[in-house]
Amino acid sequence: MASENKQRPGSPGPTDGPPPTPSPDRDERGALGWGAETEEGGDDPDHDPDHPHDLDDARRDGRAPAAGTDAGEDAGDAVSPRQLALLASMVEEAVRTIPTPDPAASPPRTPAFRADDDDGDEYDDAADAAGDRAPARGREREAPLRGAYPDPTDRLSPRPPAQPPRRRRHGRWRPSASSTSSDSGSSSSSSASSSSSSSDEDEDDDGNDAADHAREARAVGRGPSSAAPAAPGRTPPPPGPPPLSEAAPKPRAAARTPAASAGRIERRRARAAVAGRDATGRFTAGQPRRVELDADATSGAFYARYRDGYVSGEPWPGAGPPPPGRVLYGGLGDSRPGLWGAPEAEEARRRFEASGAPAAVWAPELGDAAQQYALITRLLYTPDAEAMGWLQNPRVVPGDVALDQACFRISGAARNSSSFITGSVARAVPHLGYAMAAGRFGWGLAHAAAAVAMSRRYDRAQKGFLLTSLRRAYAPLLARENAALTGAAGSPGAGADDEGVAAVAAAAPGERAVPAGYGAAGILAALGRLSAAPASPAGGDDPDAARHADADDDAGRRAQAGRVAVECLAACRGILEALAEGFDGDLAAVPGLAGARPASPPRPEGPAGPASPPPPHADAPRLRAWLRELRFVRDALVLMRLRGDLRVAGGSEAAVAAVRAVSLVAGALGPALPRDPRLPSSAAAAAADLLFDNQSLRPLLAAAASAPDAADALAAAAASAAPREGRKRKSPGPARPPGGGGPRPPKTKKSGADAPGSDARAPLPAPAPPSTPPGPEPAPAQPAAPRAAAAQARPRPVAVSRRPAEGPDPLGGWRRQPPGPSHTAAPAAAALEAYCSPRAVAELTDHPLFPVPWRPALMFDPRALASIAARCAGPAPAAQAACGGGDDDDNPHPHGAAGGRLFGPLRASGPLRRMAAWMRQIPDPEDVRVVVLYSPLPGEDLAGGGASGGPPEWSAERGGLSCLLAALANRLCGPDTAAWAGNWTGAPDVSALGAQGVLLLSTRDLAFAGAVEFLGLLASAGDRRLIVVNTVRACDWPADGPAVSRQHAYLACELLPAVQCAVRWPAARDLRRTVLASGRVFGPGVFARVEAAHARLYPDAPPLRLCRGGNVRYRVRTRFGPDTPVPMSPREYRRAVLPALDGRAAASGTTDAMAPGAPDFCEEEAHSHAACARWGLGAPLRPVYVALGREAVRAGPARWRGPRRDFCARALLEPDDDAPPLVLRGDDDGPGALPPAPPGIRWASATGRSGTVLAAAGAVEVLGAEAGLATPPRREVVDWEGAWDEDDGGAFEGDGVL
């Protein structure tokens, strides 16, 4: 097949891919520059030349040993004289046909090409240093072509130069067990095809030239020298340069030059950078890893939560612009000289600027890479454009061929290879380094599509499928990136008439909220800047002036540097605290923290003199640069924690970089910083202090890992930091790495449990922290020393301990399991044994954040008390000094007997405020009648402000808080509506539900279990029955969740967005405002049962109104501002729009709403001026509920025909805050089952307008255009008591179940 595609170089044919480039080693195969040939039989630019799939082709072309050849035989034994004669004739023909490049005109070699085969290092090191191309030697080394096995006698790993090369003593090489095990991991089976033959090149770099010459000579003729007499019948070698053995001594001396050494190192680095190779350049076989396919992965929830920690717009780590005068070419960090001003580049640039189409051969000299990327990306999304065929085989002109050849000539490569790393697969796609430097992940679409287009492994139909897959995958990414980086979604009111702007704004909330650079790559870059910050000169430009400077000025500078150093310590504490909070307070889970050690700062080169730089702690300019970078890292970590990006791959890299930055600053400033007598306020701050004291963090992390909660970890931090005050450093010099004389972890025999005064009532989950201070050589203590040491190092009291044997105190904190059977699972024994003392409960709950009536709910939940204690600062030193020694029965904590506080002040952080916000829904727990339990989606939060996991991701399979509130408000919930949490800019208003006694309780709320059990016992004490509606799935139910007694009414149901026909059947546009009703789904069916139970249990109370539009108001971004409450009443709307109702209304944000053809409802919400003036801004249309059977739902909309579907398609229920839900029975075809006419909207218009314009999902429709439409009277609520017996099958039967 290869013979059918033979073409001479430089003559592009109709079957060629990118324009060809002359290549000596591929003269007879029609080289295409980077090795990209035709799909029928050419080479694949991305394939592995040593891959097993290519061995057949290699054997057919003579590039690999034939089947049955012993791999252990010598090359001379396996090659016959006839084959050698044929080889010699081929070499002679190649010598005649290949033009020899002019050495003087050749530019210096650029390390942009990384070869996978043995021809990667075709030049001698001395020739590299002298600028000689030595083409003859390169031709002689062409014997092992790409894809060939390495010589069995060649070494696969470099050896020391002094060791002589091994010589083969026998005709056959018999591998032994020792040689096999020591042969650098190379095997003779499947890994042989993955081993790299370029390991010989490393031996060239190590100086074994004699062995190289002998090995190269064996490739042509048997023996150590190519000058040996030829055997009978053997063709003499063609005339050419002298044998390699004669030319070896001359370049040997020049190989020691710095240029040759630098080139050798660069080539070794270039070979090691090839994908799939280790540090020495050998291929490494990837080991398969076990992959867990859980329910989250199969349902898509895992991929919906995927984060990588990187932010669009920030450079990829290691990527950057090329040096001046050069352009990106090759691998990461490689470049070539630019061609600006060359006639080929200028002519191609003019054609590119005038065409308006992507260039078939693109080079950086043509202009901005963003333009070419944008054109290719838009081309890929153009139907019937044959984008894949264009990427594989574009039509080129002679100017394109000239440009490609000029770029290849200037790169400095002598010949081409399909395994070179070029940064792009196709000629038309710009170098990937420009996308990496710009942080544009969407630009990867062009490279992925080009890789598919150039592949030989897919046919046309398969490539079309892959292109569709890429389009669907990249579309949301491109929407977010373009909106965030071009500002299309950041200007409210600008371009509001464009229907695409709204979609872009909804698609990019997370991207717009994060400035470029505040991601994982930004933190890595900050670490690089911090490490490279130069030291300031001692006296500026004049050393004499610095020597004779005034003493007061010097003291002032040192004082200023000291203040900046203290701020650096505070910033380091902030970094570790941000990391700890990002990993839920578990310091042991922070990557890189367990092995953190203070690092010595980089010292300036050269001998120290009178003008040497000042020490780091006195270098104020350098400290200010460090402080700036440390604060940047701290802010970036906080943003990553809020987005939920710390527990992903990029977040781990960012965490390691942040820890390294802290270690670098600690090593420079630790010896000179003054000691703070105060105890650390958190475990993270204690970790920073230990680093600055050159102490190991392992005892602290071990104590934190074994502690039951974060409060015990902080206690361990205090224990680790307390002995530090009385210790002296051995020397004021910089901190040394923990090699020989570093501190060792304390012995575990001495612990607080052995000290007098401790008893069995110690905190049960965690061992007591060590009482001996960590030191290199602990001295024997006096008899009274154990008690004093235990009193000095005793940690702050923990919040939770074991329940006392004599029984818990009624005012203590412990789980009150309701008596008798329960609807939900009972908590575990460990949860029932957790106990908090009355005094600790009183201190922890005494905060304005917790309303007084709701504090008993915290008393019912020890886990909540432990969470509060973890956020409290340590006790004051005065309180600790006043503490007595022993424990007592009532207060097992040593600090309680002296009258001091057990815990320091509570730090009410944002997450804690959000978790405690539920306590303000209903002021008095006695007024709670209905409790709705729900599990929010990641990012949903009833308190507003966004949860710590970042913005929520829309899910059609699982409902959360958004769907729950939409059902209670009798409205639809979609990703583009105000009901979706991703569009909220503030906390939704649910006060109308609270006024009815309905409490919404999340599984993430503080004291979730204690609150449910407290409300149940409170209702039982008042001889009342509580109504509990549980929408939490079994897989989301928390461990040791609340126990709901069977004395109360309990109703379990599901929360499904797919009950909305717009979500379940998006193609059925006539059913967009229809919702499927069921007694098992949170909606009208469940509400009817709850309302009936409420009327039965509380006959004197006002009736519940659960499915009403006035129950919930949202705060979203509208044309009136970023924080507008909707639905807005008509009066509020008229007051808000009044300032714009003048002659300059066209310039205001209400232009589109006041236009004659403006849609009345956008995404079922009031939008036009007429609709907003009538119902209010954002007032939603009410859906029509249809109770269909299971079979009808499974059948889909195709089989749902008849009057009911026509009614749902034409019905238009105007917004009404007090209207009940409209429910239709799906199987009722009798008379009177449907209203006489579908409800609609009548407009009082002088222009004769009668239709309502609806815009949703990119389409516009008009309903109610016929005359005579009138809004029918409201229908009464359907009697649900017996409506669901047939459908539910007794699902809610049982004691205490509605």
Curated annotation (Swiss-Prot):
Question: What are the alphabetically sorted keywords of the record?
Answer: Activator, ADP-ribosylation, DNA-binding, Early protein, Host cytoplasm, Host nucleus, Phosphoprotein, Transcription, Transcription regulation, Virion, Virion tegument
Bias (Low complexity): 174-198, 222-233, 245-263, 272-282, 784-802
Looking at the UniProt feature table, which residue ranges are given for the DNA-binding region?
262-490
- Keyword Transmembrane helix set for record: no
Provide the assembly information.
Answer: Forms homodimers. Interacts with transcriptional regulator ICP27; this interaction is required for proper incorporation of ICP4 into virions. Interacts with host TBP and host TAF1; these interactions help the stabilization of the pre-nitiation complex on specific promoters. Interacts with host GTF2B.
Q: What family classification does the UniProt entry report for this protein?
A: Belongs to the herpesviridae ICP4 family.
**According to its UniProt entry, what is the function of this protein?**
Plays an essential role in the regulation of viral gene expression by both activating and repressing host RNA polymerase II-mediated transcription. Binds with high affinity to the sequence 5'-ATCGTC-3'. Activates transcription by recruiting a form of the host TFIID to promoters and stabilizing the pre-initiation complex formation. Negatively regulates its own transcription. This immediate early (IE) protein is absolutely necessary for the transition from IE transcription to later viral gene transcription.
Q: Which PANTHER family match?
A: FORMIN HOMOLOGY 2 FAMILY MEMBER, ORC1-LIKE AAA ATPASE DOMAIN-CONTAINING PROTEIN
Name by which UniProt lists this protein = Major viral transcription factor ICP4
What does the organism's lineage look like at the top? Viruses, Duplodnaviria, Heunggongvirae, Peploviricota, Herviviricetes
Identify the coding gene. ICP4
